[in-house]
Amino acid sequence: MSQVSRPRLAYPLIALTAVAGLAVLLGVHWAPLTRFDSALSERARTFGHAHPIWVGTLRVVTDAGATMVFLAAGTALAVVLLWLRRYADSAAIALCTVAVPAGWLAFHAWLPRPRPVAGFVTVDSNGFPSGHSAHAAAAGLIAVLLLWPRLRRTGRVVAVVAAVAAAAVVGVSRVALLTHWPSDVVGGWLLGFALASLCVAAVGMVQSCARWRSSGTADPT
């Protein structure tokens, strides 16, 4: 893409492999992972009951990763970039806005995964992976890639730290509110990163192919 940095293709493929592996472990009810999820969730439950203000705050914070917020923000950004004639960037954002929710919804339909019982927020659907966490990771990565060519070293570090922190806060909120197990959140982060990266890479490849064909047509020989 002309104005958005493209991530290396190996990274999202590794992330997708990790998501698939995690899904398999959950599907076979791997005991160490189950114990880890249960132990961390019970600590979150105990802490939440003892600190109701913490729970109330996270109920607001967690909405930053909600599906409607992600769809609205992605659509708005794609339209703005289209208006600025940054067509490839707009296409990548639009593709990501569709692909990430579709990705976690596909996992929800495929893998039966009950959520923690008696959570502070009740959600009636399968839990792996966390859609909120996937949205936060994807949005953070897209923001970093958009800003990367325009920032110097310090600015890039700040952008990466801010993106990671935002995704972490949303993910932690899902565990703390007992709407997801910790492994659901990890799966969401990995899926969001992978799909956003692949969307950017796919549009970049199409753009490169178009340029190659154009240059070949223009060649008088």
List each language-model region with its residue ranges:
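Membrane-water interface at transmembrane helix exits
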Residues: 41, 45, 104-112, 144, ...
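Hydrophobic alpha-helical transmembrane segments
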Residues: 62-85, 139-141, 147
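Hydrophobic alpha-helical transmembrane segments of integral membrane proteins
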Residues: 88-121
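Interfacial segments of alpha-helical transmembrane regions
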Residues: 7-16, 73-100
